């Protein structure tokens, strides 16, 4: 079955998206980093102008929910005063830059990112979901994250410019990397001219760079990411199912006594230099927590397309996963509709909300043919190991 048409764009601070609980606005801080003052200010804005709910995304961004047309303009102005949003919509649209979360000030990742920020005006108009990954640590950690153009290091330490989906990259120097990245973005813009404006790099029929080029080198494949818990830079944790409240987030920030925090592309946050942290309810710091194995969208009533309460179902399902050894190796996806926004890849078990119950799909996408339709949630929970 083919996938239903999903939104071809993501919300930004200037172009919020209407959802079931009002407008939602996305904030993409530079370097994926906020100061304590900025983070507390964001919580206050979410409480004052929205419904107090804050989403953490897989693109190292946060979303404020429940805005109205009147409160949106006030929220935007307040975010700009905190330097969390650009002064122009054109600049804000190009801030989709992911950084390897353990970057250090003035290291290669930092310098390349700063150079890109300085030259945003040189980029062409790009699809709304187009993004860049600065993944230049010793080992890539962002290969499982969404990005169209990547800078990575090879096993022998070369800096490579890589198109998403390619198994090779072009060798570039630190001085030429950003110029080459901008040139590749222009090549992409030319390649999709007259076609689908929402095309992504991985959808092109063939790479724009040649694998036969004398400067082409095999990329270093990696399944690494940043584990939850204590790290060299602080403490990495995640809100359950990617969402928290402004009040809970504020309490966490004050208790952590951190000066800065980083947003990670696993719907998490890295509290810099936090120590002796008591994890509050609603946040996860254990990689074995079964809630991490459930990918779930906001669901109803937050999403207008959703037909069921996905997060409530996920909260009931998580303890069953943890208590059943037969499910230890399975990943699950709960989707409010057949678009499968939370996880567009195949999953061991997918449950798609319908007006009555959930459809069950085994080793497929949310839009694939189900083996059972409209099953009662209680029956699903009683028979999780039987699918």
Locations of regions flagged by a protein language model:
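Intrinsically disordered, low-complexity polar/charged tails and linkers
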Residues: 1-16, 224-225
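Small-residue-enriched alpha-helical segments and adjacent helix-cap loops
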Residues: 2-3, 19-162, 167, 171-175, ...
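Residues that cap or delimit alpha-helices
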Residues: 68, 205-212, 275, 376
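Generic structural signal of hydrophobic/aromatic residues within well-ordered alpha-helices
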Residues: 75, 116, 201, 211-212, ...
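Flexible helix-coil linker/hinge segments at domain or subdomain boundaries
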Residues: 87-91, 189-198, 378-387
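An acidic, glycine-/histidine-flanked metal-binding catalytic module
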Residues: 153-223, 262-263
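Rieske [2Fe-2S] iron-sulfur domain-containing proteins
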Residues: 182-185, 189-193, 214-255, 259
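Short Fe-S-cluster ligation motifs
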Residues: 333-346, 361-387
């Amino acid at each position: 079955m083919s996938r239903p048409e999903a939104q071809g764009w993501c919300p930004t601070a200037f172009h919020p998206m209407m959802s079931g609980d009002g407008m939602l606005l996305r904030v993409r801080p530079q370097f994926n980093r906020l100061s304590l003052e900025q983070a507390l200010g964001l919580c206050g804005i979410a409480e004052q102008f929205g419904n107090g709910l804050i989403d953490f995304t897989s693109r190292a961004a946060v979303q404020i929910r429940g805005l109205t047309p009147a409160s949106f303009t006030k929220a935007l102005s307040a975010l700009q005063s905190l330097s969390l949003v650009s002064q122009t919509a054109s600049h804000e649209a190009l801030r989709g830059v992911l950084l390897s979360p353990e970057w250090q000030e003035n290291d290669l990742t930092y310098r390349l990112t700063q150079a890109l920020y300085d030259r945003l005006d040189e980029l062409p108009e790009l699809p709304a979901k187009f993004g860049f990954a600065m993944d230049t640590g010793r080992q890539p950690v962002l290969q499982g994250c969404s990005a169209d153009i990547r800078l990575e290091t090879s096993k022998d330490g070369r800096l490579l410019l890589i198109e998403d989906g390619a198994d090779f990259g072009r060798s570039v120097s630190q001085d030429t990397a950003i110029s080459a990245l901008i040139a590749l973005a222009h090549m992409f813009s030319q390649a999709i001219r007259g076609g689908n404006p929402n095309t992504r790099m991985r959808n092109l029929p063939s790479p724009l760079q040649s694998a036969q080029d004398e400067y082409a080198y095999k990329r270093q494949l990696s399944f690494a990411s940043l584990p939850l818990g204590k790290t060299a830079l602080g403490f990495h944790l995640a809100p359950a199912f990617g969402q928290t409240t402004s009040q809970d987030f504020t309490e966490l920030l004050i208790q952590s006594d951190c000066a800065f925090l980083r947003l990670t592309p696993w719907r998490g946050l890295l509290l810099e230099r936090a120590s002796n942290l008591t994890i509050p309810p609603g946040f996860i710091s254990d990689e074995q927590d079964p809630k991490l194995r459930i990918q779930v969208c906001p669901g109803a009533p937050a999403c207008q397309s959703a037909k069921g309460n996905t997060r409530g179902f996920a909260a009931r399902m998580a303890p069953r996963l943890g208590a059943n050894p037969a499910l230890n190796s399975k990943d699950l996806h709960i989707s409010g509709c057949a678009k499968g926004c939370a996880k567009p890849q195949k999953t061991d078990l997918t449950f798609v909300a319908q007006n009555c119950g959930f459809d069950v799909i085994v080793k497929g996408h949310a839009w694939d043919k189900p083996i059972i339709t409209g099953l009662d949630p209680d029956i699903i929970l009683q028979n999780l190991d039987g699918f």
